[in-house]
Regions:
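Substrate-positioning beta->alpha
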Residues: 154-156, 174-195, 202-203
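Mid/C-terminal beta-alpha module of Rossmann-like enzyme folds, strongest
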Residues: 2, 193-255, 269-294
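SDR active-site strand-loop-helix element
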Residues: 6, 30, 71-72, 105-111, ...
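Alpha-helical membrane-targeting segments
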Residues: 158-184, 224, 229-267
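Conserved beta-loop-beta element that borders a ligand/cofactor-binding pocket
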Residues: 109, 131-153
């Protein structure tokens, strides 16, 4: 088995490569700039320079691979950016996988992606298109839709920084929408298990952590774990969206306009237990996720 990973230098991708190499799986990572993949090479992954928007480089990277883990996505951009990187990029990876005779194609989507939200949030629209391309490809596939992914860094680090240093924590809208955060290494383990699980063939799985909380409860839980007492201040989603548009291009910005829109859409929780039954993996509770990231 030889696994091509796209997006392996990213937040989740790095942990997936780490999990694969921990089992001594043969990993080839497609990277735009090899110097950014030094940490993957140190794990024993093979680095191949290329870009999902360049069909020739993807085809070369896929040659000799039996499985593909496709993770590339962007959170911000213009409609043409989402189409070029996510939709067309997925078409390119699928074409390369088919030419290489890949046995299974594993896609990272997002919880909340469906036929309704695709017209409300550009990110969901691009993820929906990626799913559609995958299902129609003729390849054996597995699609994962994770809820908010928490780890060291990423969104959780932003939330924790706000709680740690600000006496008043701002919450978008009512804060009553529910989420189901999942620890990053639990996400990675789902991808690893999907390589060898016959029951995962041609399935789409929603995955989340063991705890469902509202945004208000999330911030209170973070404060509890950090030993802080914090007041919550709710701001209208429209104001948050305007602020996000103005700052989303700044490195380290807390949220993009699309991420604010995702919160507005409503609850982001798993609606069935298919992944639990299929993979039977232990999942890290929310408070432990926060402790690990602290």
């Amino acid at each position: 088995m030889k696994i091509l990973v796209t997006g392996g230098t990213g937040f989740v991708g790095s942990r997936i490569v780490h999990a694969l190499r921990a089992e001594e799986r043969d990993v080839r990572a497609l990277v735009r700039r090899p110097e950014h993949g030094a940490h993957l090479a140190a794990l024993g992954a093979e680095l191949v320079a290329g870009d999902v928007t360049d069909p020739a480089s993807v085809a070369a990277a896929a040659t000799g691979c039996t499985h593909v883990v496709h993770l590339v996505a962007i959170l911000t951009g213009k409609p043409q950016d989402f189409d070029r990187v996510m939709t067309q990029g997925t078409r390119n990876v699928i074409a390369a996988a088919k030419s290489a005779g890949v046995e299974r194609f594993i896609l990272m989507s997002a919880l909340g992606t469906n036929a309704t939200t695709k017209d409300l949030v550009p990110y969901f629209g691009a993820k929906f298109a990626m799913e559609q391309e995958t299902v129609a490809s003729g390849l054996e596939y597995t699609i994962f839709r994770p809820s908010f992914v928490f780890g060291r860094g990423g969104a959780l680090a932003t939330f924790m920084k706000q709680v740690r240093y600000s006496p008043v924590v701002t919450v978008i809208g009512s804060g009553l929408q529910q989420i189901q955060p999942i620890w990053i290494d639990d996400v990675a383990e789902h991808f690893v298990r999907a390589l060898d699980t016959p029951a995962a063939a041609n399935k789409t799985f929603e995955i989340g952590g063991p705890d469902i909380v509202t945004w208000n409860e999330l911030y209170r839980t973070i404060a509890k774990v950090l030993g802080k007492r914090r007041a919550l201040a709710h701001i209208p989603a429209g104001i948050a969206r305007t602020g996000a548009r103005a700052t989303q291009w700044i490195p380290g910005a807390p949220l993009s306009a699309d991420q604010v829109a995702m919160i507005e859409v409503g609850d982001n929780v798993v609606t069935n237990a298919d992944a639990v039954h299929t993979f039977q993996l232990p999942l890290v509770p929310l408070e432990d996720q926060i402790r690990r990231a602290a």
